[in-house]
């Protein structure tokens, strides 16, 4: 009998559940003496019920019959310790998450116990308790559906009057702890995606709509913080600037993706609320004015951040009204948004002399502008003599009384710095890729691809619309005037009615053909700029490619001439690189960049995300530490030149109506001459590695000390094979190679005071930036400002030194000549054009 009494109970048994329940009922008050017993009982009950849910329904029947949930609530009331509250919330979370039986979930939710726990006044000064409470709320929300959600509501006349889960949850929506914010967002999404109409009405009715305005305010603060980080990075970059920017960008995009998830629930009023709040509290008062203004009292954001945010909002938040109204604002004058109490115009970009009468442009200005569409169209002759962005036009053409945000974006591209140009290109690319945007808005902006124009006009002609047929077969066409005017005007009226933004478009603003010419002109101007990075030029090349083919009136001989001039300059720069420090890697880089550029330009969407414009700020600021004479710097310059050349070359091919080949047209490597020095030396491998035996034909004896006080005798050779070349120091007795270095970039120089000394500059054999896996190492090397190695070789006499110098110079010439020979077909683009014509 005693053995039976001492035998332990089965942990997962009904008897154990009964025993634990009895233990809880005996507890009259929870204190330090019995809290461990209570915690263990609560934890064990959760485990037993989870086990029973999968194996024996009698477990949960007992749980219901004995009203164990009531015991949980009673224990919470009589508890004086936080740890018991934590365990109770954890027990409830485990049960709700793991119970698969619908009956079990219905029972838990059908009583008021869950709502009681939700509304219970916990002491949230304990962070651990708050975390478990939020986890409990999230667990409850995870079980919501159209049947269970009604069990947590209070209604009157079929109208929801109380929803504690939602109300209590959103109180912590803006907690400083990111994990808590994330959990609350998951809770709200679970509520929105249930699809219960009465609940939808509840969450979009006052005062619950304040959640969305607070959400936009929270997002606005994120934007301001990001702007401050961007400005600090530009002014005084630090080692952790990149990490801070990355974290801030992630936070902003997480919020925008949350907006997107909320909208995907399909609650129309929520989409409207988010649209109105974003426009009213962010886009109109901050982002747009910041494009042409500088901050006053730190309440604005910098232009680069504004460009990034505009792109991100359009790319992530898929709301038709938001996309089209944002696009419509770009046609409005800058003064329509700038309040003198908030921001002041930026002298370099803001328009001058724009006058308003009761919020509208001066009539004289409008009447003058109404004549621009026809006069501009007439001015676009076949030779491209347009007054817009022509070579004789001053760069301040957009700084006039008619300047709009659209023109500001174009001005950033044609005149701004690298980051401003890239940010503006992202905005244009995002507009082009935004499916929610009306095609007529793209046409008005000047970025609707011609294939889409023809498609729409063809549809109009097929359904019998005369204007469509006339425009389709008219060489001077360029506008879908009726659709454009009605849709653009409709969104402009909404801006005035809802937000008080008055914008009356002059005649020129209604001429898409003028705008298309402006965009093309701006992009061609960008591609002709020499102070812009290749990365940004590739972005401009992608956008230009999307707009091909053009009509002759938009992409004309002037543009071709500009591109040809820029191409010739770039070709000359590339030719100089053949004589530079890295000719042995030039063809490899060219082949690689050709494939990359082809992939980028022919891609249906940009290969980079808008955040790249911010994340590169830290890297660009650190470039100031690089040594100007370093081979690393020269390698970067060579890669930049190759990238720009490849882009311009491929655009030239596109302009001829030809498709891009997979590989650039270059000659194959030439066979090594039997009379070459490398052949005479017996070099039968691609690289003379240490240990290789060579014939010391033409070798010149020399001495060099790689360590202080330790001079060694070597036989000196300079060898080239194709585009490769090496400086070789071999053992004078047996010709065994001991040391090698790249021939290219060695810059031989005879010492002026010691004519027996030969100075050589020794660069690395490879360029780390070409290997993505070594990008981190490369950045560290650059930041340390490392310089190239230096060799000083001492020869027996002046004649030997001159002989070695001549050997190096001659082999370098052979090496560079081979690179130039292989690239010759690539440089014969003009001859190829004539053949095509």
Swiss-Prot record:
Transmembrane stretches, start-end: none
Protein's UniProt name: Protein TRANSPARENT TESTA 9
The family this protein is said to belong to: Belongs to the CLEC16A/gop-1 family.
Main subcellular location of this protein, as a coarse class: Golgi
Location of the FPL domain: 42-192
The encoding gene: TT9
Keywords: Golgi apparatus, Membrane
Subcellular localization, as worded in the UniProt entry: Golgi apparatus membrane
A GO BP entry: cell fate specification
Function comment: Involved in membrane trafficking and vacuole development through membrane fusion at the vacuole. Required for membrane trafficking machinery and accumulation of flavonoids in the seed coat.
Species of the source: Arabidopsis thaliana
């Amino acid at each position: 009998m005693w053995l039976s009494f001492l035998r332990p109970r089965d942990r997962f048994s009904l008897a154990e559940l009964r025993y634990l329940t009895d233990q809880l009922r005996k507890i009259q008050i929870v204190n330090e003496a019995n809290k461990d017993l209570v915690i263990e009982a609560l934890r064990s009950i959760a485990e037993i019920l989870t086990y029973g849910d999968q194996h024996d329904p009698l477990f949960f029947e007992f749980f219901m019959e004995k009203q164990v949930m009531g015991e949980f609530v009673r224990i919470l009331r009589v508890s004086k310790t936080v740890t018991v509250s934590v365990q109770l919330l954890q027990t409830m979370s485990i049960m709700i998450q793991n119970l698969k039986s619908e009956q079990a979930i219905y029972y838990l939710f059908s009583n008021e116990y869950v709502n009681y726990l939700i509304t219970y006044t916990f002491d949230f000064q304990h962070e651990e308790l708050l975390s478990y409470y939020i986890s409990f709320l999230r667990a409850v929300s995870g079980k919501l559906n159209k049947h269970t959600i009604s069990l947590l509501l209070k209604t009157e006349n079929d109208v929801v009057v109380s929803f504690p889960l939602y109300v209590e949850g959103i109180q912590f929506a803006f907690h400083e702890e990111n994990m808590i914010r994330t959990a609350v967002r998951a809770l709200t999404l679970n509520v929105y995606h249930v699809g219960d109409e009465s609940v939808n009405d509840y969450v979009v009715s006052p005062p619950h709509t304040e959640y969305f305005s607070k959400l936009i305010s929270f997002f606005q603060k994120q934007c301001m913080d990001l702007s401050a980080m961007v400005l600090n990075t530009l002014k005084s970059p630090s080692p952790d600037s990149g990490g801070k920017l990355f974290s801030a960008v992630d936070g902003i995009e997480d919020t925008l993706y949350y907006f997107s998830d909320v909208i995907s629930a399909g609650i129309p009023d929520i989409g409207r609320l988010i649209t109105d709040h974003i426009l009213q509290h962010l886009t109109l008062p901050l982002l747009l004015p910041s494009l042409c203004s500088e901050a006053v009292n730190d309440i604005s954001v910098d232009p680069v951040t504004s460009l990034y945010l505009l792109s991100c909002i359009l790319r992530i938040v898929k709301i038709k009204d938001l996309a089209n109204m944002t696009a419509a604002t770009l046609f409005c004058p800058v003064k329509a948004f700038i309040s003198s109490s908030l921001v002041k115009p930026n002298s370099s970009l803001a328009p001058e002399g724009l006058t308003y009468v009761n919020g509208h442009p001066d009539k004289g200005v409008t009447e003058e502008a109404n004549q621009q569409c026809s006069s501009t169209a007439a001015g676009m002759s076949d030779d491209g003599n347009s007054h817009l962005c022509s070579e004789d036009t001053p760069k301040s053409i957009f700084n006039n009384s008619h300047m709009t945000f659209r023109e500001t974006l174009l001005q950033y591209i044609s005149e701004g710095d690298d980051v401003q140009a890239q940010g503006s290109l992202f905005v244009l690319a995002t507009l082009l890729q935004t499916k929610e945007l009306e095609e007529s808005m793209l046409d008005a902006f000047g970025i609707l691809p011609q294939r889409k124009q023809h498609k729409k006009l063809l549809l109009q002609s097929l359904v019998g619309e005369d204007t469509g047929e006339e425009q389709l077969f008219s060489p001077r066409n360029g506008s879908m005037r009726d659709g454009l005017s009605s849709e653009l005007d409709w969104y402009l009226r909404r801006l005035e009615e809802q937000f008080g933004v008055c914008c009356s478009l002059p005649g020129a603003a209604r001429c898409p053909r003028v705008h298309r010419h402006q965009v093309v002109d701006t992009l061609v101007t960008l591609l002709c700029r020499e102070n812009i990075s290749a990365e940004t030029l590739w972005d401009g090349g992608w956008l230009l490619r999307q707009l091909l083919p053009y009509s002759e009136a938009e992409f004309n001989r002037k543009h071709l001439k500009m591109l040809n001039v820029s191409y010739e300059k770039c070709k000359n720069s590339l030719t100089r690189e053949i004589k530079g420090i890295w000719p042995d890697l030039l063809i490899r880089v060219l082949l690689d960049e050709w494939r990359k550029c082809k992939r980028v330009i022919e891609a249906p969407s940009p290969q980079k995300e808008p955040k790249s414009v911010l994340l590169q700020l830290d890297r660009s600021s650190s470039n100031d530490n690089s040594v100007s004479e370093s081979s690393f710097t020269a390698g970067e310059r060579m890669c930049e030149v190759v990238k720009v050349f490849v882009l311009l070359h491929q655009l030239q091919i596109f302009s001829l109506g030809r498709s891009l080949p997979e590989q650039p047209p270059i000659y194959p490597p030439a066979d090594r001459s039997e009379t070459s020095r490398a052949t005479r030396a017996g070099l039968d491998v691609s690289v003379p590695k240490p240990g290789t035996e060579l014939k010391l034909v033409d070798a010149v004896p020399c001495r060099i000390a790689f360590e202080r006080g330790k001079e060694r005798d070597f036989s000196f050779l300079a060898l080239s094979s194709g585009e490769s070349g090496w400086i070789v120091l071999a053992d004078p007795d047996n010709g065994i190679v001991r040391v090698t270095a790249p021939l290219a970039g060695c810059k031989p120089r005879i010492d002026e005071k010691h004519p027996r000394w030969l100075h050589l500059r020794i660069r690395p054999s490879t360029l780390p930036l070409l290997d993505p896996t070594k990008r981190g190492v490369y950045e560290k090397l650059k930041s340390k400002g490392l310089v190239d190695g230096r060799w000083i070789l001492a020869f027996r006499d002046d004649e030997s030194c001159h002989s070695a110098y001549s050997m190096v110079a001659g082999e370098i010439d052979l090496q560079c000549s081979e690179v130039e020979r292989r690239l010759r077909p690539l440089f014969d683009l003009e001859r190829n054009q004539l053949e095509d014509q």
